Every structure is written in C-alpha cells, then in structure tokens.
C-alpha cells in the first residue's frame, strides 16, 4: 500500500529519518543487509566496552555473577531503547516515505541483530558472528509463520515486530549451534 509521501518537516521528522535509516537505508542494493551490519557493529562496540568494564570489575574483586548481570542489563536497556524508539521512528517513516514498509527504514534490522546475539555470551568469534548474521538475514527474508503475519500490524509495530521474531528464531538456532560447539 502506498500513501502520499511528504518532505520531512521539523526536528521530529529528521530525528525519525536518522534513527530509522542510520544513513545506510539510502544506499542502493541491500539496505536490510547494511542495517544488519550496523546492528552487528553496535553489538560488537557494546560487547567490547562491556568486556573492558568486566575486566576492570574483576581486577577490583567484583563477583562474576554481578558482572554478567550488568553486561546483560546494559545490552537489554540499549535494546529496549532501540525497540521503542525504532517503532516510533519506523512509524513516522511510513508517513514520510508514503509506504507501509519503506526499504530505507533499517532500524528493525539493527535491533534484530542485537536480539539475535542476546542468546549467547558475548563473542568475538568470526564464525559465530557470521552465523548469527546470516541466520537473522535468512529468517528476516524468508519470514516463516508466524513472522509473516506480524507485518500486518500497524505502522512501526508491523515494521519491527517481524524482525524481532525473526531475531528470536535466529537467536534460538544460534544458541543451539553455540551449545553444540561447546561439546
């Protein structure tokens, strides 16, 4: 469905465009893949900085359980911000671009990658990073049931909900692969 698009006007429209596209939504080719790369980069950035903080915590005698809980809490808070702001920005982008699911809006792929990697401990293993990346992209593109039905939800919720569930599917598969590699 195509609606009438309009030029962005005001700070809210520009904020929605910046958040929903991360700038990469305008690159021709595969904006969803580019958005996924941004999500993976954010995961790595957070993970590396949290790993440094964890090392410092261990050096001053902080318990490992507290460090793990803190690590997870920070990523969960960042993810929650992405989800709520992403749903708002994606919804706003439908009005700006005049379509129900503008390909320029990639915040859903960003949050999808972050969710995918919540299912395993932080890793720098390129094999696991590539596997998680590919699994999310496959589920996001394939959209098996009930992922495909979530796109029917209104505006930003419909744009983001299918990617959130695709990330859960990918995360479960990734955690199984991770567990098997530990055996």
Predicted regions and their residues:
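Interfacial segments of multi-pass membrane proteins
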Residues: 20, 38-51, 114-121, 174
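Short Lys/Arg-rich amphipathic alpha-helical segments
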Residues: 27-46, 74, 82
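Interhelical loop and helix-boundary elements at the membrane-water interface
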Residues: 2-37, 87-116, 137-169
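Membrane-interface interhelical connector segments
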Residues: 52-68
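Hydrophobic core of alpha-helical transmembrane segments in multi-pass integral membrane proteins
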Residues: 75-86, 175
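Transmembrane helix interruption/hinge and helix-loop junction motifs
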Residues: 120-127, 183
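Residue-level signature of transmembrane alpha-helical entry/exit and packing/kink sites
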Residues: 13, 17, 36, 67, ...
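Juxtamembrane boundary at the C-terminal end of a transmembrane helix
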Residues: 175-183
